[in-house]
Amino acid sequence: VPIFHFSLTLLCSLLCLTTFYCRANTQGHIPSVRFAVNTPGSAPYLYYDESAKRYQGVVVDFFNADELSSQFRVVYLDSNRARSEDLLKSSSVDLFLSSESWISKPSSFLFSEELIKHESYIYSTTNFEGPFVPEENVSSSICTRYGFVYPALTPYFDREENNIDRVDSSSQSTMAMMLSRGRCDFAIMNEHNARSVMFDPKFCSTEFYQSPNVISRVSLVFVIRSGFTSLIDKIDIALKHFVESGQRQLSFERHSGVNQFPKAKC
């Protein structure tokens, strides 16, 4: 009987060790996918959380969902918008978040289904009397994100006379800070971006107003290196579930809140 118990115990131990090894071995062989981040990111989509010391956002939530997390591991690499295209062409990275209309050579890449409709507005510290019309606001200045493309405003930025002054900044947070301090007359950003930064307590004493009209509307998608069709197929399937299940909506609410403009003083 003691020998039987010993053998049974040994067998169970070996089974446990084998199971543990198989799980560890399986996890160790999950392939990595390299994601280029337009550093320091852009809340609520993808941003670096200083307290947690890692990237957070809707993109992270999407890739951490069960549909994809078991198939590959995402490695987030610091980059910038212009450089990301070159890195993708050279296969140094596998994908990044953008819009097809912002890409210089869209025929060189693959594009996923839409993550979200990206709608940009003009923001001000004073109320708008009506829709924002660029032609009626020449000689003004607009805070922008360095390296970002603004098709609706580019003709006015590029004029030699009667132009609108483009004031570049490194992030949406610094754009809002410059707007609050009068460094520019307006700021342009996506509604989700604006909600995530302008309702921060550091802007407690500032009022922010949103233009009644959308300045630009594009589809935000994952831009994937040419030939990586297996990845785009997996992403598109997961995106459908992410949207239809309500996970996308919950993720946006978690990372940008549910506040509505105008933003009043505290």
Describe each PLM feature range:
Residues V60, R73-N137, G147-Y150, S211-V214:
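Acidic, polar ligand-binding/catalytic clefts
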Residues Q27-S107, D168, I235, H255:
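Extracytoplasmic small-molecule ligand-binding "clamshell" domains
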Residues G57-S69, G130, P134-F148, V221-N259:
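Extended ligand-binding regions for polar small-molecule ligands
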Residues D86, S98-S108, P155, D185-S216:
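A ligand-binding cleft/hinge motif common to bilobed small-molecule-binding domains
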Residues Y48-D49, F63-S70, E135-V138, Y146-S169, ...:
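Ligand-binding cleft/hinge of the Venus flytrap
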Residues S7-T18:
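Bacterial N-terminal signal peptides
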Residues T39-G41, K117-Y121, K202-K240, V258-C266:
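Periplasmic-binding protein-like
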Residues T39-S42, S51-A52, E100-W102, T125-E129, ...:
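Short coil/turn segments
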